[in-house]
Amino acid sequence: MLNVSGLWAEYQGKPALQDVSLQIASGQLVVVLGPSGCGKTTLLNLIAGFMTPSAGVITLDNIPVSGPSAERGVVFQNEGLLPWRDVVSNVEFGLQLAGMSKEQRRVTALKMLNRVGLAGFEHHFIWQLSGGMRQRVGIARALAVDPRLLLLDEPFGALDAFTREQMQELLLTIWRDTGKQILLITHDIEEAVFLASELLLLSPGPGQVVERLSLNFGQRYAEGEPCRAIKSDPEFIARREYVLGKVFQQREVLI
């Protein structure tokens, strides 16, 4: 279990997060939603071990987070892929750093590429891929090291609406099949409501958790209900509008 308790943080000398607490249990997909500048990415960077909090505690399975680790796989908004490597060697990169044999890391990388729907693209270079395909490579690379926790920082924000929905479906399929703890950062309200088993809404910076919602739309998709049927369901629309109202309420507080 990931446990974040009483987290305070600064970014470039300014307060970014204020007394943030959350937990992610095994098999839970938690989405953090908030406007630009609310500290969402700072929160992810702290959990990933890329930054150190001003105060508070972060533990994964009761072990303090003190730096980056293969226990926490990260998928970045800009993918962070290596353009001089082909697809399969990008997926192998973390395994190579971990000292896995060439043969075993190739087997693992090919398995992950098949999982994300990129079988047959192993020897393409990154510049030959669409935005959605590059994000699939990023997800495959993160999954290859078999992390306990998967962290995604607005991974679908730059994609067109059709591709974004495909990637949301892929993520839910991976969540269903692996049972991993997942934390996703987004500013897209519909995406947040669709994916989250628990949704945390952050206030404008410095970010505080102002709303927590338990949702089941992602679980419904994982159990076989079509995405379009879920998103056109009056219950889904009502939840989406409720969250939208909360977001605008926070903006009005600032004004």
UniProtKB/Swiss-Prot annotation:
Main location (coarse class): membrane
PROSITE patterns: ABC_TRANSPORTER_1, ABC_TRANSPORTER_2, TAUB
Keywords from the UniProt entry: ATP-binding, Cell inner membrane, Cell membrane, Membrane, Nucleotide-binding, Translocase, Transport
Catalyzed reaction equations: taurine(out) + ATP + H2O = taurine(in) + ADP + phosphate + H(+)
Topological type in the membrane: Peripheral membrane protein
A Pfam family recorded for this sequence: ABC_tran
SUPFAM superfamilies the UniProt entry points to: P-loop containing nucleoside triphosphate hydrolases
Residues binding ATP, per UniProt: G34, P35, S36, G37, C38, G39, K40, T41
Cellular component GO terms, alphabetical: plasma membrane
InterPro entries (UniProt xref): AAA+_ATPase, ABC_transporter-like_ATP-bd, ABC_transporter-like_CS, ABC_transporter_ATP-bind, P-loop_NTPase
Transmembrane region(s): none
Molecular function GO labels: ABC-type taurine transporter transporter activity; ATP binding; ATP hydrolysis activity
Domain of life, source organism: Bacteria
Top-level class of the enzyme under EC nomenclature: translocase
Subunit relationships: The complex is composed of two ATP-binding proteins (TauB), two transmembrane proteins (TauC) and a solute-binding protein (TauA).
NCBIfam families assigned to the protein according to its UniProt record, in alphabetical order: PRK11248.1
Descriptive protein name: Taurine import ATP-binding protein TauB
Organism: Yersinia pseudotuberculosis serotype I (strain IP32953)
Origin organism lineage: Bacteria, Pseudomonadati, Pseudomonadota, Gammaproteobacteria, Enterobacterales
Gene for this chain: tauB
